[in-house]
Design a protein with these regions (language model features):
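Transmembrane beta-barrel strand/turn architecture of Gram-negative outer membrane proteins
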Residues: 49-63, 169-175, 186-198, 288-290, ...
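Residues that define the transmembrane beta-barrel architecture of outer-membrane proteins
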Residues: 35-44, 75-79, 117-121, 150-154, ...
Length: 334
């Protein structure tokens, strides 16, 4: 597709991009960034799908790129690149743990608090118990830039579809974290659900509990910090829930809310240089409308408001930062 994004930021982050920065927005009265217009076409996607018959099955492959790579989110990058044969998948695609299936719809390409849009290199195997129940196991490279690693992350996901209206997913993750000669195991669990209340009204919800990792779920504090004698871990819970209403064939809208809260670990906070950058709570609420005047075109408008609360106050005593934006998008799908 070809995609153009724009954002008017009444209050928000310092980076020059029209996407979510809730975990790093300036605290009130401290170099706030307000009254900004930002735009980009970097979320434009190009992709190819391949299929080749082998024995009694097809070997499927996918390559997809966009331009949200690099420090400034303006370089070409790989989104998906994988082979799929039978029950096996090898390559890069959505993480088996941090799946986007249960995120309420949003215009923001980086999503909001409580969500994850993680893609990882992985080897994945899917086992079907019944037509409505399957177990997916994978080894993944989460590419955690904050530390060195010698082992992949181990992830598992159990999916079940009760009927055409209700589906759920339970997930688990474990990953060794190493800083120099110190090591700890990170872990996480997640559960998501989608329920179609009526043919035109649906609810999505997703929950995570994670300790010691910041590479899968978005907008977290650093998963681990080194004290010199040990590794201290961050621990958090997050939830996102949203209602989507289809008004007619051309118009739909979503109202949603995301929240993330971090446990207080004093040893962790003592090991961090600046506790104003370590968050105690994050939340965001958003509402959007998508209009499709003709089949390949979608136009969207969205309002989002959110806050972050830091563990430590800034020099002026403030612990709160705000994210207050209007997002616009135009998409041509081909």
């Amino acid at each position: 597709n070809v995609r153009a994004d724009a954002s008017y930021q009444a209050e928000g982050g310092a980076r020059d991009m029209p996407y979510n920065q809730i975990n790093s927005v300036p605290l009130e009265g401290n170099a706030e960034n307000s009254d900004r217009l930002r735009s980009t076409l970097s979320a434009t996607r190009l992709g190819l799908d391949f299929k080749a018959p082998i024995a009694d099955q097809n070997l499927n492959a996918k390559i997809e790129v966009d331009f949200l790579g690099g420090a400034n989110l303006d370089n070409l990058r790989i989104r998906h690149a994988y082979l799929n044969y039978g029950n096996w998948l090898i390559g890069q695609t959505w993480s088996n743990f941090a799946t986007p299936d249960y995120i309420p719809e949003t215009i923001d390409a980086l999503a909001y608090v409580g969500a994850s849009i993680k893609r990882t290199p992985q080897v994945r195997y899917t086992h079907k118990f019944t037509p409505n129940t399957n177990l997916v196991a994978a080894v993944e490279d989460p590419k955690d830039a904050s530390m060195s690693q010698r082992m992949p992350a181990f992830t598992g996901r159990l999916n079940h579809k009760f009927n055409d209206a209700l589906s759920i997913s339970g997930r688990a993750m474990a990953h060794e974290k190493r800083i120099q000669n110190q090591e700890e195991w990170a872990y996480g669990v997640g559960v998501g659900a989608k329920f179609d209340i009526t043919p035109v009204t649906s609810v999505k919800a997703d929950y995570y509990h994670v300790k010691g990792d910041s590479s899968f779920v978005s907008f977290t504090n650093p998963g681990v910090v080194a004290t010199g004698t040990s590794i201290e871990q961050s621990e958090f819970d997050s939830i996102t829930v949203g209602l989507t209403q289809k008004f007619n064939d051309k118009l739909r809208g979503t109202l949603a809310y995301g929240y993330m809260t971090f446990d207080k670990n004093q040893d962790y906070l003592d090991a961090v240089a600046d506790d104003t950058k370590i968050n105690k709570n994050l939340w965001q609420a958003w509402g959007n409308l998508f209009y499709s005047p003709v089949q390949p075109v979608s136009l969207g408008v969205e309002y989002v408001y959110g806050e972050r609360e830091a563990f430590a106050p800034a020099a002026n005593g403030s612990k709160k930062g705000e994210d207050n934006r209007v997002n616009l998008v135009a998409i041509y799908n081909f």
